[in-house]
Structures are given as C-alpha cells and as structure tokens.
Design a protein with these regions (language model features):
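Alpha-helical recognition/docking segments in bacterial nutrient-uptake
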Residues: 1-103
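Glycine-rich phosphate-binding loop signature in dinucleotide/nucleotide-binding domains
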Residues: 47-49, 108, 162-168
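Periplasmic-binding protein-like
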Residues: 50-56, 114-116, 146, 166-176, ...
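Glycine-rich phosphate/diphosphate-binding loops that line cofactor/substrate pockets in enzymes
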Residues: 104-113
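Flexible loop/turn connectors
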Residues: 165-267
Length: 267
C-alpha cells in the first residue's frame, strides 16, 4: 500500500529500473487498506503469482508481516523500525536523521520547535517523534507534535493550529514535502514571514521543495538510489535465500530559503 507523495514515485522508479536490468518486472496493485493488502498477499501466495513482495510503511503492530511469514513469500521491508527484523530489509536511521534536524535548528537559536508528523501508528513516525522530543529535551528546547496524514489539508490544519497558539513555534519540521508546502502557504496567509519569523524544514526533499518560494530547506535522501538498493535486496534474496539488512545512507540536511536564525524573542 503506497502513499501519494513524490517519495513513492521516486522509490518505484529506482526499483523498476534495477529489476528491468535483470529482466524482471514490477507489479503495482492499488489497495485501500491493510486488510485488502493482506487478501492480495494471500491470493498471490496461494497462486504463486509473484516471486517476492516489497512492503512499505511498517506499522507498530503490523498484521501483514505475520501473514507474509505464514505464506512464505520472499519479502523485503523498506524503512522498518530497526534492522533487526526476520525479513530482508532496507533500513533508514530515522532517529539519527531527526536528531540532526533538531540540532541544526537549535544551533540557529530556535527554542520552540514543532513537528507535524505522519500517522502515529507507523513505526518510522514513532521513531522520529521519540527522537524529536528526546533531542529537544536534551538541548533545552520546547518540542510539540501535531499529527498529520501526509496530505495538504492536514499540513494546512496543523500549521494553523500551531501558529494560532499563544507561544507559537519559531521552527516547524514536517514529515513530508506536501505538508511542508501547505505550511508555507499558511504562513503567507497569516502574514508570518518565512524565514524571518518562522523556519520550516521538510523531511522528504523533492521538486516541490526546490520550486516553492522561498525554496524549502529539507532532509534530502536519494530516494531513486534507495529504490535501486531495495531492488538489489530483492534480487539477492531470490538468488541466495539469505535474509540480510541493508542500511540506506542517512538523509542530509539541505538548507535553502526557509531556515535561518531564530527571531530575537526566541533566542
């Protein structure tokens, strides 16, 4: 089950490119929820219709993994909660990347930080939130979290709520590019100057970030290359049957036009 963000389009492109080079095809099947996804896996497994599956957006309690283990379909997990999974996986250290983001903003003088997260039931959301709150506490900053769903509307709603507080944040980290662009629009509507009064940082770098005005600072990951890495993980699993963990490069912070030193009142 995939999201609609540019992240997934880039990931799919990388997977497909690498598989095609080995004469294999990528099958995409759109489903509305995990229950429908599980039914699809059962049909694929019972009919031996696929050689392997790639699973994304791992939940804290994820019934899909138990079913895939039961069916015995070779499985690759993308972005799981840790590298210590009983499945082949491509792992991202979301906690360390979040600590890097918070440290950067606090280094700019920000003491009131907020995070607009993805859905809280996702494992990577929890990892980022825990790291965000932990690093804020360690550095003596105040951290607040508002849950979103990766969509434009939730980014708009969350940003309005945060900026409407009596002591609004001077910096906001968004869990994806779509919500960050929506937040930038809200700041313009509310006459909150970016970055002079409010710094914004997107988690997934994309053309949306680069083309916004001002261009959004972002945590940048080469998602296409990660897709190639996922495909290589699939091919190695099929060739050897060995379950291995692969670590993706850490996202790097790209400072553009939406982050700067904190307003004097926040310092």
């Amino acid at each position: 089950m995939l999201g609609f963000e540019p992240f997934f389009m880039e990931l799919i492109g990388g997977i497909e490119e690498s598989l095609a080079a080995e004469g294999r095809s990528l099958l995409l099947h759109v489903v509305p929820d995990h229950d429908a996804e599980i039914r699809t896996y059962r049909r694929w497994g019972e009919g031996k219709l696929v050689d392997a599956v790639v699973v994304v957006n791992i939940a804290l309690e994820d019934a899909r993994l138990e079913v895939l283990g039961e069916l015995g379909i070779p499985t690759v997990i993308v972005g799981g909660p840790s590298p210590n999974l009983p499945f082949a996986n491509v792992w991202i250290d979301n906690a360390q990347a979040m600590r890097t983001a918070v440290t950067h903003l606090v280094g700019l003088g920000h003491r009131r930080l907020a995070r607009v997260s993805g859905p809280r039931h996702l494992a990577h959301t929890q990892a980022r939130t825990d790291a965000f709150m932990g690093e804020c506490a360690r550095l003596g900053a105040h951290g607040a979290v508002v849950e979103g769903d990766y969509g434009e509307e939730s980014g708009t709603r969350a940003t309005r709520a945060l900026l409407g507080r009596g002591s609004p944040p001077s910096a906001i980290i968004y869990d994806n590019d779509v919500m960050a662009v929506a937040g930038l629009g809200v700041a313009h509507e509310m006459d909150v100057a970016v970055p002079e009064r409010l710094s914004l940082l997107a988690w997934d770098d994309s053309a949306l970030c680069r083309l916004s005005h001002p261009a959004l600072s972002a945590m940048s990951l080469d998602v296409h290359a990660m897709g190639v890495q996922v495909a290589d993980c699939v091919l190695n699993l099929l060739a050897s049957g060995t379950v291995r963990s692969y670590t993706a490069p850490l996202p790097r912070l790209v400072a553009r036009g939406t982050t700067t030193t904190a307003p004097t009142a926040d310092g």
